Amino acid sequence: MGMRQIETLVFDYGGVIVNIDDASVVKAMWSLGVTAFKRLIHIRKIKRLMHQYINGLVAEAETLQEMLNLCRKGTSIEDIEKVLEELCGNLPEERLKALVKLRKRYKVYLLSNINDTLWQKSLNQMNQLGYSKDELFDGVFLSYAMRKEKPSIEIYEEITQLTGLNPDTTLYFDDRAENAEAGKNFGFQSVPVKTNHLEEHQEWQEIIKNIV
């Protein structure tokens, strides 16, 4: 894709900045006693609960209790929380180094569907690697705090209003096709990222090749 002028970068978090493996988390739920029959009957429910947990738009305790109801007797909320920690994924330090450099040339924002628990754990991951969110991003916009989620048009409108960014000069990276499409429809130069493979995209390669 041929990029127009770029002044602002907006990144999703899971699958773009941090490498994630949702499938491994679902499999880990099976280890808590979700039987084969329940897997078949409740797979949509489990996926809904995972989505609900990640986005943080429903009370976390309520979501965890629904998950607990699907598990074997004797399973605790703590057992489920331990499994869900895997959603924090693996954070490549090279991407964080690149973000710091990109901020010298662009405004850099994070726009993520994520809950408070996962975000706090993600901040700890950044800190362990020697970075703070303020070093990496000019602003952070999270679904649980905004009380809205991608791909709703309202979340793109709000980040635009709060930052003053120009959608036409904004490059937006997201690994969910529906989010990337919504961003494109809003006016962003949108990149549908292959999950966990940001570096493979020409748009990423172009913006980092000239930074020092």
Where are these regions (language model features)?
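Asp-based, Mg2+/Mn2+-dependent phosphohydrolase catalytic module
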Residues: 2-6, 115-116, 122-212
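Substrate-recognition element of Asp-dependent hydrolases with the DxDx(T/V) motif
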Residues: 77-127
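A metal-dependent, Asp-based hydrolase signature
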Residues: 50-81
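Alpha-helical elements of Rossmann-like donor-binding domains used by nucleotide-donor carbohydrate transfer enzymes
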Residues: 24-27, 48, 62, 66, ...
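Helical cap/lid subdomains and adjacent loops of hydrolase enzymes that gate the active-site channel
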Residues: 37-43, 49-52, 80-88
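Soluble or luminal CAZymes and related metallo-dependent hydrolases
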Residues: 59, 87-94, 151, 155
